[in-house]
């Protein structure tokens, strides 16, 4: 079966738009030093991000996450909660320096149960 010229032309015109939308929305996970490993224990994580850069932060805690939320928003960027276990931080373009935000997570692990506050400190440079 052969594709008509009109359908082929439409696919050529539309396909680049789909590709650019998908690539514009993708963000990578940033390496974090010092992150939570058990429920009920507060922790702090440190990471680097360029001005205007975006990082994904999946919560990797052994067990089941019952709930999570943004506790403190960053002063020099935007923090979004994508789902119960993943957050996305975008640094403001043109800003360089530290930025801090906190998330709260509640759940049950193999040995502990409770609520933890995870504070993340970005070095925007």
Model-derived segments and spans:
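C-terminal edge beta-strand
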Residues: 25-27, 109-125
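A short beta-strand micro-motif common to beta-rich folds, especially ectodomain repeats
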Residues: 96-109
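C-terminal segment of classical bacterial N-terminal signal peptides
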Residues: 14-23
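Surface-exposed or secretory-pathway low-complexity segments enriched in glycine-proline
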Residues: 47-85
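Bacterial N-terminal signal peptides that target proteins for export
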Residues: 1-9
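Residue-level recognition of well-ordered beta-strand positions that form the cores
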Residues: 90, 104-106, 121
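Short N-terminal segments immediately surrounding and downstream of signal-peptide cleavage
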Residues: 24-46
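Extracellular/luminal low-complexity segments enriched in Ser/Thr/Pro
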Residues: 86-96
């Amino acid at each position: 079966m052969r594709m008509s010229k009109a359908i082929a032309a439409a696919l050529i015109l539309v396909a680049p738009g789909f590709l650019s939308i998908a690539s514009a929305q993708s963000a990578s996970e940033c390496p974090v030093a010092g992150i939570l490993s058990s429920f009920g224990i507060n922790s702090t994580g440190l990471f680097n991000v360029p001005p205007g850069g975006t990082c994904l932060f999946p919560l990797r805690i052994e067990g089941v996450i019952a709930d999570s939320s943004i506790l403190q928003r960053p002063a020099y960027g935007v923090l979004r909660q994508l789902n119960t276990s993943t957050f996305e931080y975008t640094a403001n373009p043109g800003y360089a320096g530290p930025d801090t935000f906190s998330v709260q997570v509640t759940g049950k692990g193999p040995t502990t149960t409770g609520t933890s506050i995870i504070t993340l400190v970005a070095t925007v440079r």
